[in-house]
Amino acid sequence: DEIQKDDEGNWLHVIPRERMKVKSEKIPFDRKTPLSPQAVELLENTPRIGFHGSHLIFPNINKGKRSAFTRDAVRALIKRMHDKQRKIDGIGWVDPDQKDRTGKPRIVTLHGCARATFNTWAKDARGYGHKAFPRDLRESCLDHRNESYQCAYDREQALGDMREVFDAWGEFCFSEIK
């Protein structure tokens, strides 16, 4: 993953396609996500902790390791918070719409929470007070693609439109902080 500027000086988070879940040859371009001014400010002001020469924003410095913060660390944190909440309310942090193999509600995941929160916000223009964003643009922001037709015609992402969505999302996410 890499943070870089485009030709107009706008910041992007770029993930090479080969590192993405969808690695189809029908999607020839890397995943680019425009960064909102709030995201850029957060990244610029986040102290770099770790080891000399580290380029990692959130390094794993546990037990002397010098690597990136992992999904497993986040999963373990969510599991601990779930267990603590479950002792309080008997339920914990579960998604009632998602079931495990035994039919019980699954513990929430960072991936699911983040995507569901973004998609709910992006769909509800009236409720959240932003411009309405078309479904295909919301899906593009989530990197959801229907290979059978979309990939045949989409040669690149609509970064200008996506930037508008992510700028509004940044405003919403930071609206209670400033």
Language model segments and positions:
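Conserved tyrosine-mediated DNA breakage-rejoining catalytic core shared by Y-recombinases
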Residues: 1-45
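Catalytic-site neighborhood detector that most strongly recognizes the C-terminal catalytic loop/helix
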Residues: 3, 19-21, 63, 141-177
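Active-site-proximal structural scaffolding
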Residues: 6-8, 28, 32-36, 112-116, ...
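Glycine-rich, flexible loop segments associated with nucleotide phosphate handling
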Residues: 9-16, 26-32, 100-111, 131-140
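Short secondary-structure junction motifs
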Residues: 10, 53-55, 133, 148
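Active-site/catalytic core of tyrosine-dependent DNA strand-transfer enzymes
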Residues: 34-108, 112-126
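Non-transmembrane alpha-helical segments in soluble domains
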Residues: 75-78, 123, 139, 166, ...
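C-terminal catalytic core of tyrosine-transesterase DNA break-rejoin enzymes
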Residues: 113-148
